[in-house]
Amino acid sequence: MRADLSQATFIIPIRIESPDRLRNVITTTAFLLENFDTNIIIQEVDKHSVFEKEALPILEDIVEVDIWKNFNFIHKKSDEPLFHRQRVLNEMIMECETDIVINYDCDVILPKESYTLAYKGIMDNIYDCLLYTSPSPRD
């Protein structure tokens, strides 16, 4: 059963410049779709959409839920050599219809309970904002 995170939107800005990044985007997106009833916006900024051509067919094949239920993919064509992540995030926030917005990195998967505990804390007004940082290798 998927956990209810329906009042949240994961925003994931991407530029897929390597096979590793493609694998990570597919893995994280499938993880979110399979485990949570939530909203997801992925915006790819690049000359051509690698996500649409290579990731979407795989996701449609491997994910057992309707991926399009609360999922929005946006491709913005750009010849810009640099990826302006913050600008893309600002654009994506404007697309959100939920009060809770999760700036999500496509290279990260946390334990499922981390998502549900954070969501509950925000919904119960215990937290206004949460930030996850990975522990230092020295810790």
Protein language model annotation of sequence segments:
Residues R15-D20, K47-S49, D107-L110:
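Short acidic, S/G/P-rich loop/turn micro-motifs used as interaction or catalytic elements
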Residues D79-E95:
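Glycine-rich, basic loop-to-helix element that forms the pyrophosphate-binding segment
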Residues Y132-D139:
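Conserved small/polar residues in nucleotide/adenosyl-binding loops
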